[in-house]
């Protein structure tokens, strides 16, 4: 089965072709980072308009790259939610218009299910069951994954997502957009232990997260720098130490909760997905813990940690392979800006 995947939930336009026999044939991505940078964040209306401009050229790119003709495609998968309503509508409209013109079925995919399954795109994919740590700008969750469509939420953030905390911390420190990668880069130049920040809910006894207090601690520390009248090199060193303190705290919590989930479920495989899954400090800490405690940790390729069409095409192919009745052939569709992943559980 050959599936075309279309991702447009936020500020990346992604298209890809995935074949159940041959794997990922092609994927193309356009990021809107440069466009949104001057505003310090994603502007939903601009995001929607840019998806309209980019989708069809990216479609041409993946078709040419893979040598695929439209007659070869068996189905079209698109991100149905969660995400920005306007951006989702663009992708859904394009997917259903193409499907109508080409006489193909469609299937709407949960964005987080795409992330959750994206490590299956690697050459040696992890077998089920496993624990999934989903960490992105909008979501932080620990899931028990028994099979495609069989998900149990073990823990989730009670306020800010991890990626959101990274972005807000970057803004408080005065870094550019997107903030997550910027604060991570700055942290690598900071001194470990120079600034120690709280580890929210580290000993809560459950698998939930909270990052709002960590963000507040960063703000408090910046006010201390201001009161001390730090400037020049001294201020830059202090900011680097603060970034290091923030990243160390966030990583400690993510790792500790992941280890607790593995212990609670007695599973030996951890999958990490979502944009924060590309963070080098998080990967290093999890790899060290895996070596010490004897479990396997799996990630998607770095290029597929961000939003992308490949994960949507994969999820569509896996769902249609198991439940062909989920194919839509009347081309009526809705989008779901808010959509609980656990609601997909079968």
UniProtKB/Swiss-Prot annotation:
Q: Which residues form a coiled coil?
A: none
| Record's subcellular location | Cytoplasm
Q: What is its EC number?
A: 2.3.1.234
Cofactor binding, note field: Binds 1 Fe(2+) ion per subunit.
List the catalysed reactions. L-threonylcarbamoyladenylate + adenosine(37) in tRNA = N(6)-L-threonylcarbamoyladenosine(37) in tRNA + AMP + H(+)
Q: Which family does it belong to?
A: Belongs to the KAE1 / TsaD family.
Binding of Fe cation, residues: 111, 115, 307
Indicate yes or no for the key word Cytoplasm.
Answer: yes
Which CDD domains does this one have?
A: ASKHA_NBD_TsaD_bac (cd24133)
Task: Tell me the superkingdom of the source.
Answer: Bacteria
Q: What is this protein called?
A: tRNA N6-adenosine threonylcarbamoyltransferase
Cofactor(s) recorded for this entry are: Fe(2+)
- GO molecular-function term, one example from the UniProt record: iron ion binding
Gene Ontology biological-process annotations: tRNA threonylcarbamoyladenosine modification
Describe the function of this protein: Required for the formation of a threonylcarbamoyl group on adenosine at position 37 (t(6)A37) in tRNAs that read codons beginning with adenine. Is involved in the transfer of the threonylcarbamoyl moiety of threonylcarbamoyl-AMP (TC-AMP) to the N6 group of A37, together with TsaE and TsaB. TsaD likely plays a direct catalytic role in this reaction.
List cellular component terms (GO): cytoplasm
